[in-house]
């Protein structure tokens, strides 16, 4: 890929593919739709979908509004995330995250899915916010929503969700919660990142206020399952516990989190505390968090959770946290919660903890503590805790509030648990210091006030008396007022005389304390008691009379109703008022009571007669109270009270109320009697259901003896109450009908009519249902009918026509009506008595209503009534003609006798059918009354007479149900007379004050709607003629409905119904002029109505079917105000002429917008008419204020819809339709949408009138370039594309006919094409490419793709053309444009561009310009613009070549391009291009073009170039060869083996020449080697020596490295084929390594090359070669160790030990000669690796020489010291040698190794010992080597080598005394010996050392303490003897050994030499450090006998050291002062 292409690709938006795939439509994955459906939705349709969903969510969640502007607005449609900065993207991510979390609640709603679809398609949240998306969907993991989103997400590997969900994406499906739980467990996710993410979900949701039920359910269940798994598994991971605790605590402490959030935490929290033994700190954090206030949690739930986890914690003493007491005080109803928990679960342990915290501040918890401590089942432990703490706190506090709280609680506690409190008191007295805080005895004693309140409620009478007095005294002092009132109120109901007397002892005080309401409430139970005590009532009456009523006379009515009423009635068992008590009602304050002032004497008289006169007295009192009520000023209230008492549970009050009301019904007259009776009936009606009163005897309207006896003797019996009910109902027969006419058949009666009508109907109901005794029912019915008289039939009609009347009642009414009609003739006043039958036709509509009744029996009786009114032709007067409907009766239209008779006879003919089917009557009228062909005028007159008769009753009968029934009869009758009759009724509804309107307004909305709908139903197609009648009201009525100036309650409903009729066919039946008038009125109505009503009207207008001829005429009428000619006829002249054009525009908009133009028949005259609107608008554009743009757009849309369907061009021409108006509108309008629609029209007209369009094509496209190209919306570009696709082909066809060749065609099209290319920089970026692709396809890609691309490239040559874009951005467009077409077109463009390049380069030296792009250069352009044109075309050409690379191109075209480019390359030597990049770019282009050749051709061209080309061409061809060769398939290479061999041969020649082509040649060979096939190995082998040879000829390190790297590849590739060249490779590599001038990289590569030879062919490397390699590598180790070590490892692994070891022996000689320590270390490292990698089977045969070699090596110390080498160097070398020896030992078994070790021992100890002194230096050196080896063995093999200490032990026993005696003085040997012994003690583990051996060796070891004292000890390097003795002590626990060791060392501290004493103390210190615990028993002798002396040593250093030892001992034992005294 070229550098330009790389730059273009790097800056391309990731949205490019999506935006260009369908010209702006979104592509890719979709949440809602399958891929095939998703691809059909563009960005606008997805946005509309999202908008609808967002609007719905906004109504559900107003908080969604915050995302509207940024995510769901028009601006969001243009957001491209790929071009945003990082900061902008981060901000957008945060917004998207919040939005997704809020959408989480609505995922299951379709509205939520729409919003998510938008975020997926627009913001790619499924790729760029995948974590937030998954978090939002996780709560729905088991629903279908989850797999739907999972299937489209792209999860990055860095996401915590990757491991869990990435494997599920391919086959997404709902997943179980167990899968998620497993994924977040530490077994799957050790980092716990996913767990932390899920655990924080709720916290984040609370923070943002987006908590929802699904989230909480998921979170809780997941946490619970996770903990359950831990509970049943291996337990919870520490990290899991930490995360969960933090999460739970944070949520519990979150302010205002809410009840649901907190409830979600409790289950996993409890499970956590039960599963994991939490440490104190996290447990305390949980407990404290549970007490956090202000979280919005349910206090009961939270406290119960706290109690559960506290009760589960077996030992908890840290309380509840720092602020627990204060927080507990904020818990609502804490006491009740604790008591409930105690009752159900006990929770004794937890309760103790909570109560203890509350007791810290009892004043804050006084109420809650009292509730808990007063509980009857309080645990003893809580009682004891509370007693102790309260006593202690109350005694020690200075706060009076706290002390009072403690005292109150303790006092109550002591009453319930005296022994526990007393015990606590005694214990507190004993424990508290009496002087400071003596226990306050008063804490457990109640205050006098509390005693008084307790006494008030005591069972003992004397206590209650005392308590009452005390409470009154306290209240008088102002203490405890509320409590006092409560206590005294309770005692008012006391039945003991002494207590009552105590209450009234101070009446004034009692009045001051008790409010009147409280007093009445307190004393009321006494008066209403079942068995009241008369003398107690007397006491109360005295107080009320003498004091209460005197002070509060206003309370009289309340006292009468609440206290006195139930005591008036006397029964056999209840005598509340004796004579003496009754007399009290005559005196004092009772005199002032209204009712008692008049009935007082009667009460007294009633009680004087004693028991015998009690029954009579009750009646007397009742009548007296009735009379008092009659004269009362509060009559209505009194009646309400009496009726309420009918429900009283106290029989006395209930029966007394019945008696009083009975008396009132009989006594009252007029409205009061009627209203009272109605109230009683309303009360009784629902309460008598299920009761039967028929068996009650002696029941009548009078109160008889039986009734009063039942009241006196059996007041509680139900039968007594029923008798009272019957009696009062019987009294209703005395209610008198109001004077005057009552309109029975009306729904709008006056108040008196309504009351009596209701009363009469109720009485009729009672009289006809089988509940009352027969005599009572007959009496009531007779009384009612007597008063009704002739009105009875109308009354019966009102009953059977009422929908509320039960079926039996309707039947009774019809039967009574039948009887009335038969009996009416017998009345003396009846016309029938004079021989004239009565005409009952006025009730015929009511009979028709009954015939439609739902009950069959009703219909049957109705038929009988119908027969009874049939009569003959000569009927007399009409019954109730003037009274049936009251004032409206005159509107009733009567049938003629003939018509009446015929109508009834016709009905009776099918009467039985009416009985069977209630709907038959309607069908009958439909059959009879509809117009029928063949009927004469007489029949029509009869039919219309009946319709008029029925409609007149509809108009007169002002009751909704009858009207609806009658109208339903005519609903299917089609006759104009119905509409004529209905119009006056409808028109009256325009006036809200009319009677009809007022009546209808009083009805429920449902009935209003049915009525209006029934009337408007008469507006049908069949009755349209009524609307056209001269002088008729119909048409005016319709137009008035459209008059917005008229306001009425019903006009809107009428208008809607009229619309329905119009749409239903009425409009189509109108005359054309009526249609026009109606539509104009409708349009004007739309503009005047409110928005909602206007929308309804618009919908109607849209549905009206208007024919084209009417449309044309309508357009003329509506356009009149826009015409400029003053002579044009106007339909209407308005006052405000200047506003008429604007108004006309609005009306035209409404009209044009209402038509569905695609469904209207296409008509050229109609198009011309619409064009006339545009012409008129052009003239009025300046004076029209608004709407003109929209109208133009809609008109263009209409024209477009019509023109698209017109196929006859001649029709358009005949209608004189032209394009000039369209062009004028385009030029005049500034609205882009108008111009767009105009362009669409122009594009359609191009098909019909092409010549006219071509004449105006340049203005069209100039406008497009200046305006539409700069807008970014799908519609605009749809318009542009359509315009281009229709007009451009017309233009190009004309140009092609004029051009002779492609260059001429380009030149002639230059101006036309420049319109588009000049605007490329101003187009919206993501729409630029789709447009040009469409443009080129419309032009023809084969002809115009090349010139369009050339012009687009030419834009980059000037700043103006680039339009502030960078060059790379400008060149991106043509490159992407070419990419949209197939290979053949691209190849063709490639050839055209090469030709243009040739023309441009030729024009550089010509005066007459030939090139196409030269025509774009002007005189003002810069002189270098032609060079820039060439440069940018070359860059563009590179882009094309990049797109064609690897594609199958036309070889002929490519070869032609290559030939032309070669010619051009030769011509770039012109001076004008010498300083530019053109030559090099041209060569690159040539090379890229060559890549388009096939592999065969490519290899052939390469071979030719290597033979004939220039050096630069060879370099280029080799580079291309190296780059492209790996792309050739193996089967093709197999075919080209000879060519490749020839190429390699030529490359070998180039390498031999070592010219400038070497580097390129090496790369070419390297490319062949890396991808070679087997058949090419021979050719590669032939070139290998040349490659090796060239290394010595070149000087450049980079080339040397490349050559060596190639040699390495060749060696590894060719393997055995490289054997002949091993020596040359090794020589070259070793020479390079030895070179001191070579760069490190070359040396490194030389080592790599050597390694490749050793690894590939190790068996073919000779010993001599190996020796050279070893020596060179060992020498190089001085310079750098890494390469040497790597090569050592390779040699050791690849060369067999048998072959390598002799070479090592030989090399050892050379290394020794050099004598360098570095070389020796390197040698021994090589030896170690050799032995490490040696095969075990090879060692036995080599063991003797190897061991001999090591013995020789071990003598190296001696030889090196003879040379004066530094000891440290000697030690390092020896360490290296020993390391090698240890590798050998690792390979040996014990039988093999042991003899070798013994031989090593002999070598070190015996071989040189004969005849020499023991202090011989060389012998000492060998011993040092032996001990070094032993130390290494012990370190490496631990106790496995301990037994070998037995071999050394005899010699050790010799050496230790020798050192002690001074015969041996080698400090290194001494140090090493002690270290070996110490190591042996350390690792032994019982393998060698025993107590006996240790004891044996102990004296010799201790004897070493005084030796080599100059060695100063330090923590890092202690004295060897001290370490050795410490290891000895640490290796044993035997007391004998430790005692001997301790004693021996302690004895050494008594040396005279202070240095020795110090050394001994150092050893002693190390010994106690190592085994202090086992030596505790040695403390006495060690401290008292030795350390005590040393602490007083004369040497300060000794004293300090002794104190140090003592301190170490005291760490184990504690203070040892007693041993030192």
UniProtKB/Swiss-Prot annotation:
Entry coiled-coil feature ranges: none
Keyword Repeat found: yes
Intervals holding HEAT repeats: 837-875, 976-1014, 1281-1319, 1935-1973, 1977-2015
Localization: Nucleus, Nucleolus
InterPro entries noted in UniProt: ARM-like, ARM-type_fold, BP28_C_dom, HEAT_Utp10/HEAT1, U3snoRNP10_N, UTP10
Keywords, ordered alphabetically: Nucleus, Repeat, Ribonucleoprotein, Ribosome biogenesis, rRNA processing
Pfam families attached to this UniProt entry: BP28CT (PF08146), HEAT_HEATR1 (PF23243), U3snoRNP10 (PF12397)
Purpose: Involved in nucleolar processing of pre-18S ribosomal RNA. Involved in ribosome biosynthesis.
Subunit structure: Component of the ribosomal small subunit (SSU) processome.
Similarity field: Belongs to the HEATR1/UTP10 family.
Name by which UniProt lists this protein: U3 small nucleolar RNA-associated protein 10
Organism, scientific name: Cryptococcus neoformans var. neoformans serotype D (strain JEC21 / ATCC MYA-565)
Lineage summary: Eukaryota, Fungi, Dikarya, Basidiomycota, Agaricomycotina
């Amino acid at each position: 890929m070229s550098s330009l292409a790389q730059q273009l690709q790097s800056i391309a938006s990731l949205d490019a593919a999506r935006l260009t795939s369908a010209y702006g439509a979104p592509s890719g994955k979709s949440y809602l739709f399958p891929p095939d459906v998703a691809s059909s939705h563009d960005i606008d349709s997805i946005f509309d979908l999202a908008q609808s969903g967002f609007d719905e969510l906004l109504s559900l969640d107003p908080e969604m509004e915050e995302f509207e502007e940024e995510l769901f607005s028009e601006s969001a449609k243009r957001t491209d995330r790929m071009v945003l900065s990082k900061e902008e993207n981060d901000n957008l991510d945060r917004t998207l995250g919040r939005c997704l979390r809020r959408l989480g609640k609505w995922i299951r709603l379709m509205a939520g899915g729409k919003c998510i679809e938008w975020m997926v398609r627009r913001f790619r949240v499924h790729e760029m916010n995948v974590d937030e998306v998954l978090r939002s969907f996780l709560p729905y993991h088991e629903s279908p929503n989850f797999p739907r989103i999972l299937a489209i997400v792209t999860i990055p590997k860095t996401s915590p969700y990757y491991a869990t969900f990435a494997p599920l994406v391919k086959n997404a499906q709902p997943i179980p919660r167990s899968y998620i739980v497993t994924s977040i467990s530490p077994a799957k996710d050790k980092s716990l990142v996913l767990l932390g993410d899920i655990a924080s979900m709720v916290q984040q949701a609370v923070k943002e206020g987006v908590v929802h039920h699904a989230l909480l359910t998921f979170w809780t269940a997941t946490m619970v399952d996770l903990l359950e798994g831990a509970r049943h598994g291996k337990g919870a991971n520490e990290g899991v516990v930490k995360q969960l605790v933090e999460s739970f605590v944070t949520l519990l402490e979150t302010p205002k989190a809410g009840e649901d959030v907190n409830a979600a935490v409790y289950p996993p929290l409890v499970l956590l505390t039960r599963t994991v033994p939490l440490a104190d700190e996290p447990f305390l954090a949980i407990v404290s968090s549970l007490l956090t206030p202000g979280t919005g949690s349910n206090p009961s739930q939270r406290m119960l959770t706290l109690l559960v986890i506290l009760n589960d914690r077996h030992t908890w003493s840290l309380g509840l946290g720092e602020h627990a007491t204060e927080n507990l005080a904020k818990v609502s109803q804490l006491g009740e919660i604790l008591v409930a928990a105690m009752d159900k679960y006990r929770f004794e342990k937890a309760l103790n903890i909570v109560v203890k915290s509350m007791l810290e501040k009892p004043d804050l918890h006084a109420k809650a503590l009292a509730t808990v401590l007063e509980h009857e089942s309080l645990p003893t432990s809580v009682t004891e805790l509370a007693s102790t703490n309260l006593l202690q706190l109350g005694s020690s506090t200075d706060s009076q509030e706290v002390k009072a709280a403690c005292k109150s609680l303790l006092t109550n506690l002591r009453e319930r648990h005296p022994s526990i409190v007393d015990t606590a008191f005694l214990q507190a007295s004993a424990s508290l210091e009496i002087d400071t805080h003596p226990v306050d005895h008063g804490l457990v004693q109640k205050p006098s006030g509390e005693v008084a309140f307790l006494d008030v409620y005591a069972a003992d009478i004397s206590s209650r008396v005392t308590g009452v007095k005390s409470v009154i005294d306290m209240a008088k002092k102002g203490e405890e007022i509320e409590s006092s009132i409560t206590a005294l109120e309770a005692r008012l109901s006391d039945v003991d005389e002494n207590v009552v007397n105590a209450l009234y002892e101070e009446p004034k005080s009692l009045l001051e304390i008790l409010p009147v309401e409280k007093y009445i409430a307190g004393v009321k139970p006494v008066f209403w008691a079942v068995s009241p005590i008369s003398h107690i009532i007397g006491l109360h009456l005295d107080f009320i009379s003498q004091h209460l009523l005197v002070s509060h006379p206003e309370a009289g009515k309340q006292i009468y109703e609440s206290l006195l009423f139930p005591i008036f009635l006397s029964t056999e068992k209840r005598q509340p008022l004796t004579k003496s008590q009754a007399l009290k009602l005559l005196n004092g304050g009772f005199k002032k009571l209204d009712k008692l002032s008049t009935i007082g004497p009667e009460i007294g008289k009633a009680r004087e007669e004693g028991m015998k006169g009690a029954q009579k007295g009750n009646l007397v009192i009742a009548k007296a109270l009735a009379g008092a009520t009659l004269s009362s000023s509060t009559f209505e209230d009194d009646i309400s009270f009496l009726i309420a008492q009918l429900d009283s549970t106290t029989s006395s009050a209930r029966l007394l109320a019945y008696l009083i009301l009975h008396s009132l019904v009989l006594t009252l007259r007029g409205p009061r009697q009627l209203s009272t009776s109605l109230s009683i009936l309303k009360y009784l009606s629902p309460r008598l259901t299920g009761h039967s009163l028929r068996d009650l005897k002696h029941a009548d309207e009078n109160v008889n003896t039986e009734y009063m006896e039942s009241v006196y003797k059996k007041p509680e019996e139900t039968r007594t109450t029923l008798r009272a009910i019957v009696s009062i109902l019987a009294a209703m027969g005395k209610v008198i009908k109001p004077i005057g006419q009552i309109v029975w058949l009306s729904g709008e009666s006056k108040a008196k009519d309504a009351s009596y009508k209701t009363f009469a109907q109720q009485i009729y109901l009672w009289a006809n249902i089988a509940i009352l005794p027969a005599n009572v029912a007959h009496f009531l019915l007779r009384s009612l009918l007597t008063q009704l008289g002739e009105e009875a039939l109308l009354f019966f009609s009102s009953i059977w026509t009422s929908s509320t009347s039960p079926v039996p009642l309707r039947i009774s009414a019809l039967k009574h009506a039948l009887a009335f009609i038969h009996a009416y003739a017998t009345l003396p006043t009846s016309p029938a008595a004079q021989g004239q039958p009565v005409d009952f036709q006025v009730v015929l509509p009511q009979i028709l209503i009954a015939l439609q009744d739902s009950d069959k029996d009703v219909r049957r009786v109705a038929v009988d009534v119908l027969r009874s009114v049939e009569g003959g032709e000569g009927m007399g007067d009409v019954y109730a003609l003037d009274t049936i409907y009251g004032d409206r009766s005159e509107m009733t239209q009567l049938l003629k006798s003939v018509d009446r008779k015929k109508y009834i006879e016709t009905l009776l003919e099918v009467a039985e059918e009416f009985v069977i089917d209630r709907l038959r009557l309607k069908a009958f009228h439909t059959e009879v009354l509809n117009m029928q062909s063949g009927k004469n005028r007489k029949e029509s007159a009869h039919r219309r007479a009946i319709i008029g008769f029925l409609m007149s009753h509809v108009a007169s009968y002002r009751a909704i149900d009858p009207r609806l029934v009658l109208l339903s009869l005519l609903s299917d009758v089609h006759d104009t007379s119905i509409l004529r009759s209905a119009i006056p009724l409808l028109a009256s509804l325009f006036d809200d004050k009319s009677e009809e309107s007022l009546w209808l307004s009083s009805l429920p909305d449902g009935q209003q709607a049915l009525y209006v709908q029934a009337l408007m139903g008469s507006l049908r197609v069949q009755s349209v003629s009524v609307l056209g009648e001269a002088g008729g009201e119909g048409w005016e009525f319709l137009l008035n409905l459209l008059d917005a100036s008229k306001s009425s309650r019903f006009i809107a409903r009428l208008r809607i119904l009229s619309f329905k009729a119009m749409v239903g066919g009425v409009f189509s039946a109108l005359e054309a002029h009526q249609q026009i008038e109606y539509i104009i009125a409708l349009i004007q109505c739309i503009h005047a109505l409110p928005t909602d009503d206007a929308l309804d009207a618009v919908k109607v207008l849209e549905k009206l079917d208007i024919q084209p001829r009417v449309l044309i005429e309508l357009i003329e009428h509506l356009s009149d105000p826009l015409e400029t000619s003053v002579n044009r006829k106007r339909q209407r002249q308005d006052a405000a002429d200047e506003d008429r054009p604007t108004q006309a525009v609005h009306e035209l908009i409404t009209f044009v917008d209402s038509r569905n133009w695609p469904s209207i028949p296409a008509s050229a005259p109609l198009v011309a008419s619409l064009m006339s609107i545009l012409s008129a608008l052009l003239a009025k554009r300046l004076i029209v204020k608004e709407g003109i743009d929209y109208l133009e757009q809609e008109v263009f849309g209409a024209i477009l819809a019509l023109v698209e369907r017109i196929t006859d061009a001649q029709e358009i021409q005949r209608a004189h339709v032209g394009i000039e108006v369209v062009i004028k509108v385009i030029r005049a309008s500034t609205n882009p949408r108008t111009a767009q629609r105009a362009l669409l029209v122009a594009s359609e007209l191009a098909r019909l009138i092409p010549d006219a369009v071509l004449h105006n094509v340049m203005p069209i496209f100039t406008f497009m370039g200046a305006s539409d190209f700069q807008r970014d919306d799908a519609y605009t570009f749809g318009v542009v594309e359509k315009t281009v696709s229709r007009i451009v082909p017309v233009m190009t066809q004309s140009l092609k006919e004029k051009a002779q060749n492609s260059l001429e065609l380009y030149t002639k099209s230059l101006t036309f094409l420049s319109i588009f290319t000049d605007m490329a920089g101003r187009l919206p970026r993501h729409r630029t490419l789709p447009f040009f692709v469409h443009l080129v396809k419309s032009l023809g890609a084969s002809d115009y793709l090349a010139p369009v691309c050339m012009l687009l490239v030419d834009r980059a040559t000037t700043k103006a053309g680039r339009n502030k874009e960078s060059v790379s951005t400008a060149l991106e467009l043509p490159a992407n444009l070419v990419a949209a077409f197939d290979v053949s077109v691209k190849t063709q463009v490639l050839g055209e561009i090469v030709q243009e390049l040739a023309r441009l380069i030729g024009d550089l030296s010509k005066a007459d310009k030939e090139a196409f792009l030269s025509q774009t250069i002007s005189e003002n352009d810069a002189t270098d613009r032609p060079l820039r044109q060439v440069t940018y075309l070359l860059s563009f050409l590179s882009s094309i070549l990049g797109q064609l690379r690897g594609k199958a191109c036309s070889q002929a075209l490519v070869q032609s391009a290559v030939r032309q480019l070669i010619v051009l390359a030769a011509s770039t030597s012109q001076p004008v291009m010498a300083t530019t990049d053109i030559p090099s770019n041209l060569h690159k282009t040539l090379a890229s073009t060559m890549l388009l050749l096939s592999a065969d051709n490519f290899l052939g061209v390469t071979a030719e170039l290597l033979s004939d080309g220039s050096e630069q061409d060879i370099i280029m061809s080799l580079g291309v060869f190296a780059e492209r060769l790996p792309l050739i398939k193996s089967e093709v290479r197999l075919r080209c083996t000879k060519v490749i061999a020839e190429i390699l041969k030529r490359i070998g020649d180039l390498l031999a020449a070592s010219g400038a082509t070497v580097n390129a040649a090496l790369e070419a060979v390297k490319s062949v080697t890396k991808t070679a096939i087997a058949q090419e190995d021979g050719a590669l082998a032939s070139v290998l020596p040349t490659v090796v040879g060239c290394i010595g000829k070149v000087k450049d390190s980079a080339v040397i490295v490349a050559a060596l790297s190639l040699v390495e590849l060749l060696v590894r590739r060719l393997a055995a084929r490289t054997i002949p060249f091993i020596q040359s490779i090794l020589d070259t590599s070793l020479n390079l390594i030895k070179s001191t001038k070579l760069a490190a990289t070359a040396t490194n590569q030389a080592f790599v090359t050597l390694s490749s030879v050793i690894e590939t062919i190790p068996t073919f490397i000779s010993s001599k070669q190996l020796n050279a390699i070893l020596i060179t590598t060992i020498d190089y180790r001085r310079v750098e160790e890494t390469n040497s070590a790597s090569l050592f490892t390779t040699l050791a692994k690849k060369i067999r030990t048998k072959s390598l070891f002799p070479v090592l022996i030989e090399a050892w000689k050379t290394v020794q000669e050099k004598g360098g320590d570095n070389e020796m270390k390197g040698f021994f490292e090589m030896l170690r690796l050799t032995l490490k990698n040696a095969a075990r089977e090879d060692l036995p045969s080599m063991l003797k020489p190897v061991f001999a070699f090591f013995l020789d090596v071990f003598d190296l110390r001696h030889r090196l010291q003879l040379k004066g080498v530094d000891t440290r160097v000697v030690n390092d070398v020896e360490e290296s040698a020993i390391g090698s020896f240890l590798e050998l030992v690792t390979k040996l078994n014990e039988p093999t190794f042991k003899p070798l070790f013994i031989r090593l021992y002999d070598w070190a100890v015996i071989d040189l010992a004969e005849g020499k002194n023991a202090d011989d230096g060389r012998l000492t050196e060998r011993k040092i080597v032996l001990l070094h080896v032993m130390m290494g063995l012990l370190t490496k093999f631990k106790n496995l080598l301990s037994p070998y200490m037995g071999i050394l032990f005899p010699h050790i026993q010799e050496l230790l005394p020798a050192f002690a005696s001074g015969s041996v003085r080698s400090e290194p040997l001494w140090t090493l010996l002690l270290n070996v012994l110490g190591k042996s003690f350390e690792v032994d583990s019982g393998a060698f050392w025993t107590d006996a051996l240790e004891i044996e060796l102990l004296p010799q070891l201790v004897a070493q303490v005084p030796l080599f004292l100059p060695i100063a000890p330090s923590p890092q390097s202690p004295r060897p003897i001290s370490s050795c003795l410490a290891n000895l002590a640490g290796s044993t626990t035997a007391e004998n050994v430790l005692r001997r060791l301790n004693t021996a060392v302690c004895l050494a501290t008594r040396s005279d030499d202070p240095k020795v004493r110090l050394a001994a103390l150092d050893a002693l210190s190390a010994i106690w450090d190592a085994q202090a615990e086992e030596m505790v028993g040695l403390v006495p002798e060690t401290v008292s006998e030795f350390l005590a002396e040393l602490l007083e040593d004369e040497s300060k250093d000794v004293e300090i050291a002794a104190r140090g030892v003592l301190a170490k001992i005291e760490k184990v034992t504690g203070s040892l002062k007693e041993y030192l005294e």
